[in-house]
């Protein structure tokens, strides 16, 4: 949610052993939010840079009843022309691999975003993953991994597909149109 709209507020919760490193994670969070920002800043300078960019940054204490082990939750609020958007993402490192474990209300994701990844959100209904797979296959693209959690409250699904090669913007747009996607984007990390 929010796309490339200006970020106004970021709240982070550090769980487990990451709590003791939270101030040292401020600079990598800044770099992830604002790729053009100065790299390698000390914690206080990173917080100042966030303020200079008009971003309120808050490191929250976790609620003791949350069993998220060593993970980080980022809640990002964006605003443009008095319209507000909110995105929440939780990440964890599993077997040495950084994974997104939750995106907004899509729990149990555990997606490795390294390489080429497609993210498509749509109204949940049968056959959508087959349509996506068929379109990729027709273009010689193989699926390396897939996660497709549903949000039963909104009746939406999020499909995160890791492919063996980049997917063109044209193909992604074609797939998004065919499945009537609410949102669709690709990452190359």
Q: Regions from the language model: what does each represent?
A:
Residues 1-189:
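A conserved regulatory-domain signal marking ACT and ACT-like small-molecule sensing domains
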